[in-house]
Amino acid sequence: MSSESSREENVYMAKLAEQAERYEEMVEFMEKVAKMTDTEELSVEERNLLSVAYKNVIGARRASWRIISSIEQKEESRGNEDHVSTIKEYRGKIETELSKICDGILNLLESHLIPSASTAESKVFYLKMKGDYHRYLAEFKTGAERKEAAENTLLAYKSAQDIALAELAPTHPIRLGLALNFSVFYYEILNSPDRACNLAKQAFDEAISELDTLGEESYKDSTLIMQLLRDNLTLWTSDNAEEGGDEIKEAAAKRESGEEKPQQ
C-alpha cells in the first residue's frame, strides 16, 4: 500500500471513529497521519480532525478532574479524611492520564506539526494548540511544574499572537479563537482578570469593526467565537459573578458538532 493511500485510509478511519465517538482511536489514526508529514503539512481537514480527536480525549478527563476536585473540597470541608485520601488517589490517576495525553500532542507538535507548518494560519493554529495543552497541564499541576506549564503556555500563545496580529484578519476564526483561549489563560491560570478582559475586549472590538468584510465561509465560525468572547467579558466584569457560577467559554475544536464544515 502506498503512503498516500495509507494516509487516506487513516483519515477515513479517523472520521469513522469520530462518528462512533471512539476518540482514543481517532487520536491514534490522526497521529499516524501526522507522522507521515515530515516535509508536507497536514491539510485543513486533517488538522481539524486531529484537533477534534485530542480535544475530546482531553475534554473528558478535564471534566472528570473538575468533578473529583469539587467532591474532594466538599469532603475536606466535612472533615471526612478517609474519603479525602481515597479521592486524592483517584484524582492522581486522572492526572496521570491528563499528563500522558498532553505529552503526546505536545511531542507531536514539536517533532512534526510546527516544523512543517508553512502558512501563517497553520503556524498560529499549532502554536495555539501548543499553548492550549500546556494550559491544561497548568490546570492541575502544582509548584514548580505548574509554573513551568504556565510559562510554556504564555510563550506559545505569545508566539501565536505575534503571527496572528501581523498576518491574520481580526475576524479570522483562528485569530479569534487564540484571543479567546489566551484571555482564559490570563483569567484562570495567571489570575489576571484585567489582562483577560483587555485582551478579550480588544479582539472583540477589532473584529466588530471589520465584520462587514467577512465572507460567508467563516461568518458563522467568527461570530460564534465573538459571542463566546462577549459571554466571558460579561461574566468577568459582573460585580456579582460568583466563582464557578457560570462556565468560562473556550474555543471549541472544529467540527465538534459533526455537522459544521471545517474552516478553510
From Swiss-Prot:
Originating organism: Mesembryanthemum crystallinum
PROSITE patterns: 1433_1, 1433_2
SUPFAM superfamilies, per database record: 14-3-3 protein (SSF48445)
Comp. bias regions, Basic and acidic residues: 246-264
Entries under InterPro entries matching the protein: 14-3-3, 14-3-3_CS, 14-3-3_dom_sf, 14-3-3_domain
Protein name according to UniProt: 14-3-3-like protein
Domain of life: Eukaryota
Gene3D superfamilies: 14-3-3 domain
Function noted in UniProt: Is associated with a DNA binding complex that binds to the G box, a well-characterized cis-acting DNA regulatory element found in plant genes.
Disordered, as annotated region: 239-264
Taxonomic placement: Eukaryota, Viridiplantae, Streptophyta, Embryophyta, Tracheophyta
Family in the record: Belongs to the 14-3-3 family.
